[in-house]
Every structure is written in structure tokens, then in C-alpha cells.
Amino acid sequence: MINKTRHNARRYALQALYQWFFCETKPDALISQFMEEHDLSDTDVAYFKEVVTGTIQHVAIIDELMTAHLDRKISALNPVELSVLRLSIYELLHRKEVPYKVVIDEALELVKEFGAEAGHKYVNAILDVLSSEIRKGV
């Protein structure tokens, strides 16, 4: 069963990270803007704030891990798929209490909703490999 408040946090985090991709707004300003413009009443706001801030703070490490498994340059990725991958890799690295299957399932749902038609297949392939690497022994 899907945790709706956590799902909504990821959904808004994806949108915030997508926006950050284009304008690199500071995390606090980005979060404040989302808090003002969206009804987050059915959202795990603390989780939203953490994953947005954490993903942006750790983007260099996240991108380095991801790049080793890409079949193209990171700059050639669809911005939605890139944002979903960054968010999911952050969760795999820093939210170990969240099962890797949940991270992947949520990522696929987000890509199906916001991304290119076959984007979920690409995201699944990358996260499948990375989840094994990151969560070894977990």
C-alpha cells in the first residue's frame, strides 16, 4: 500500500528538483516557493524538505554515481528522468529505512506521470543496478 503523504512529498520534490534543474534556486527559496504555491496539507512536508535539500546538497556525488551507469552524457538526459534519478539515488543513499523496492516503485510512478513515454524503462534499469550497489548488505 502506498504511503500517500510520502508519495506526495516525492511528487512535489520531483517538481521542485525539475525547477531547480533550470534555475538552480537555493533550496530554502525553492522550498518556500513550493510551500506558498501548493497545498501541502496531504504531504509529508518534513520529508519533502529533506529530500529536496539533500538531493541538491549531494548532487555532485549523486551524479557521479549515476554517470557510471548511463549510456549517454548526463546533459542528454530528459530533465524529468534526471530529476527522478537524483531524488531516488538520494533516497537510496540517505534513507536506508525506505526499502529499495519502494524507492524504485515510486520513481517509476513519477516517471510514468511526468516523464517521456518509455522513460520508466530507462529509470528502472539505472536504479536496479544502483540499488544493488548502494544497498549491498542492507
UniProtKB/Swiss-Prot annotation:
Residues making up the signal peptide according to the UniProt record: none
Molecular function per GO: RNA binding
Record has Transcription as a keyword: yes
One GO biological process term: transcription antitermination
Entry keyword annotation includes Transcription regulation: yes
Assigned GO CC terms: cytosol
Pfam families per UniProt: NusB
Keywords: RNA-binding, Transcription, Transcription antitermination, Transcription regulation
Similarity comment text for this entry: Belongs to the NusB family.
Function in brief: Involved in transcription antitermination. Required for transcription of ribosomal RNA (rRNA) genes. Binds specifically to the boxA antiterminator sequence of the ribosomal RNA (rrn) operons.
Protein name: Transcription antitermination protein NusB
Organism this protein belongs to: Coxiella burnetii (strain RSA 493 / Nine Mile phase I)
Gene, per the UniProt record: nusB
